[in-house]
């Protein structure tokens, strides 16, 4: 086994590895390979921590790191770092390679003076590399209430005392949202790879219509593209044959959805009034793809 810095001749192979590693894991298809492709030219990218793992001369794993920041409660910006995607070829998963690659990368990061990392992931895996809930360090996740314990948001202080007793909020760097911000570029890039079937399946992250917020739990819930294929971003009530069924603003969509608050309340631990539901949606909708720029 060998771990080394990625070089340009590895790029396509590593992007294909990343695509294979993430396909249909967290969502139908994946975008992580496009994130990696675009991140290499970002000022946040850290070339010294762009690492590949080889086994018998074959690249079987990869990880990249990025600069990030935390907004402290006084409004100032505190330097931190994040990492990912971290990819292991499907044939080598669950054999300890991912943890070996990560621990090696963390040691290199510490040697470079990187004091604090935060990321989204499964604590059952990442705790073996020293990560714990970020809320224990008073680091809040931008998309969740500041007083909540977010089970997937993790952090680790690599240099003792670097973070200290500070408190602040973390938002992932913009580079991780490039597929949402450049959908046409992503589709063109994705078309350069062999076609693979996208599947909506149990175990993935919860999927929501990126326009109305409706949960997407099965293929039949989803909209359709102009060629008749499934569109996993939008529901059948919002998107059909490659177009939105009607134009509206975000506020108009929230007003429309609020009519169904009684149905929503069947899934809620505590019933919401119509006004409470609308207030909640004003926090949620700006994170949806259709409204992200407006938000």
Question: Predicted segments — roles?
Answer:
Residues 92, 96-104, 114:
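Conserved acetyl-CoA pyrophosphate-binding loop and the N-cap/start of the following alpha-helix
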Residues 209-212, 235:
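Short cysteine-rich clusters marking metal-coordination/redox-active sites
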Residues 222-232:
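Short linker/helix segments within small regulatory modules
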Residues 85-93:
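A short, internal acetyl-CoA/4′-phosphopantetheine-binding micro-motif in the GNAT/acyltransferase core
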Residues 2-14:
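A short beta-loop-alpha structural element at the N-terminal edge
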